[in-house]
């Protein structure tokens, strides 16, 4: 018997995004075209420009409204770069970034006791994992990059015309006022303006540009871990960026010029206070509500809804794989029948260049090199790859993973091997497909 609740939609994005459809289905909703009846639900994407169509139909037909958004930990790359989300926010009351009326998250923050010991312990442990492993909403950055010299003020840019900014009534004037306040309140400090991930990739423009740079103001428009930036900052300024929430997790009390979900709970310095938020919360309570109780998390490898901790496992592995692979690979000595399989594992960021001559493997854009074991690898700084299936008794089955070693092939071992590249820790899985 089908017990899924009908969820009507009038936005082509719900039709195109397979991952979103799957998460909604597992959460108990059946995406449907047509007109809803009383008691059905209508889906809209946050406060996107075409939300009004769904809002109007829901009101006219006396149906409920479900606002769908990406969860606060989304993926390695932004959605505009092609990565699907690892979780969704399904809110029946409002939008978490619009303080003009309560949303489900604000109701949790207002009314849930948030005193369960196990819940708060989970929150503290997850915060520690997120900080230690440099996990953020988007994760396409190196963790070995040198941050600016400490002692700066961090000012966070956002994408132009973002819905969260419209909800806070913020535009170009507010960003200029925020920068002016940072300069006025910290006259002796350098200022780092952090560009948004989508701005860095060229998908959307921000409010700041190179024209705002001076001798004491630097525009940081390269990918870098936000946790590295928090470590060296003496103050953090934001309108409503999620990095303001992450700054709280890093131990800062950010100056907030908008009205995001994390403002008003005693953890930020609010320049535009929200009415009605009078409760004082701890960092763990805010995190537990926003990251454990509020979102729907999804495991694309096991095709199931999951806990936050499972998503942290996935993002840790995917981020490590991206950091290994994003510059691309040159593969030497690979037989033709192996190449499609290797491409599916190591070629997700950039397609592999196959080369038969190891001496010609060096590439001008600093691609990394791996070679089949025994291809004269002892004298070459290449990764060594052995393509044995994990279940080697099933020799006719396609390999479910690839074992790699950056020192030597696994059979003759006159010097230490490096097992850190083996299978799961790198995220290099070939036979397990994401949904």
Question: What positions do the PLM features span?
Answer:
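Catalytic-core helical/loop segments in enzymes performing group transfer/polymerization on anionic/lipid-linked
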Residues: 1-435
């Amino acid at each position: 018997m089908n017990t899924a609740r009908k969820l009507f939609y009038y936005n082509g994005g719900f039709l195109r995004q397979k991952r979103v459809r799957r998460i909604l289905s597992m959460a108990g909703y059946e995406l449907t075209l047509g007109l809803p009846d009383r008691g059905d639900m209508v889906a809209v994407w946050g406060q996107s420009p075409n939300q009004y169509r769904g809002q109007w139909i829901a009101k006219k037909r006396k149906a409920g409204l479900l606002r769908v958004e990406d969860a606060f930990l989304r993926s390695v790359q932004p959605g505009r770069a092609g990565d699907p989300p690892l979780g969704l926010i399904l809110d029946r009351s409002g939008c978490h970034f619009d303080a003009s009326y309560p949303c489900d998250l604000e109701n949790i923050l207002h009314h849930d006791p948030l005193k369960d010991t196990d819940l708060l312990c989970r929150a503290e442990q997850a915060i520690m994992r997120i900080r230690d492993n440099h996990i953020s909403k988007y994760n396409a950055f190196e963790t070995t990059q040198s941050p600016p010299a400490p002692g700066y003020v961090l000012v966070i840019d956002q994408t132009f015309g973002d819905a969260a900014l419209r909800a806070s009534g913020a535009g170009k004037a507010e960003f200029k006022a925020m920068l002016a306040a940072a300069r006025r309140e910290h006259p002796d400090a350098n200022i780092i303006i952090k560009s948004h991930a989508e701005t860095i990739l060229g998908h959307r423009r921000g409010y700041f540009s190179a024209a705002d740079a001076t001798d004491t103001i630097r525009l940081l428009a390269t990918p870098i871990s936000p946790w590295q930036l928090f470590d060296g900052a003496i103050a953090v300024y934001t309108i409503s960026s999620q990095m303001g929430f992450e700054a709280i997790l890093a131990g800062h009390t950010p100056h907030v010029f908008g009205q995001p979900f994390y403002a008003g709970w005693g953890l930020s310095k609010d320049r535009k206070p929200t009415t009605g938020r009078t409760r004082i919360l701890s960092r763990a309570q805010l995190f537990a509500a926003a990251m454990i109780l509020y979102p729907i998390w999804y495991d694309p490898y096991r095709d199931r809804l999951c806990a936050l901790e499972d998503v942290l496992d996935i993002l840790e592995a995917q981020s490590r794989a991206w950091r290994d692979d994003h510059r691309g690979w040159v593969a030497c000595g690979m037989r033709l029948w192996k190449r499609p399989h290797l491409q599916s594992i190591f070629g997700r960021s950039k397609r592999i260049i196959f080369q038969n001559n190891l001496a010609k493997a060096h590439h001008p854009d600093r691609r990394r090199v791996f070679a089949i074991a025994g291809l004269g690898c002892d004298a070459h700084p290449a990764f060594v790859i052995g393509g044995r299936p994990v279940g080697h008794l099933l020799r006719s089955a396609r390999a479910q993973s690839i074992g790699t070693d950056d020192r030597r092939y696994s059979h003759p071992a006159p010097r230490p091997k490096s097992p850190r590249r083996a299978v799961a820790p790198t995220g290099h899985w070939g036979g397990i497909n994401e949904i």
